[in-house]
Amino acid sequence: MAAPGTQALRGPRPRTAPLLALAAALILLGALMRAPVLFAYQGPWTAHALDVHLMAHAGAYSDISHLFLRDHLGEHPMPYFDFRFEYPALTGLFVWVASFAHTSVAAYFLTSTGLLLCLALVTVWALRRIDGANPWLFAATPALALYGTLNWDLLGICLLVIAMLLFQRGRN
């Protein structure tokens, strides 16, 4: 809980809608940096060939599309059981569930973007409820556009912020 009188120094809590709108816009901007290049790709569907194409365009590379091809996620293999996966276990489950959306890399990227957008919005919602937190520092950071759809780190960030909120409320 914040020290007495510090809320007056910070001012009133920001309204949630502008924070959510800004975070959503940044995530969608990140997807817009990557999706057109991904959809325009006409080369061989291998991780290396796609990476060469994506890296020729600033901001277009994403682990999401790379690992879809590298790990054959369109065939829905189970991370850690069917192939080695370098991300934490809950991320592996997230990646596996998202793989059932479609068998194309573009559809998988868009599905993952939608799920990551939901995680970003939940993170903003939780940050807004933590005493002393400044949710603008998350919702307005340009890094959200650059890294929000780079990989699945928003899952861990969202879970951490929810844990902090629950801890503050005494639900540890």
PLM regions: where:
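TM-lumen/periplasm interface segments of multi-pass membrane proteins
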Residues: 1-131
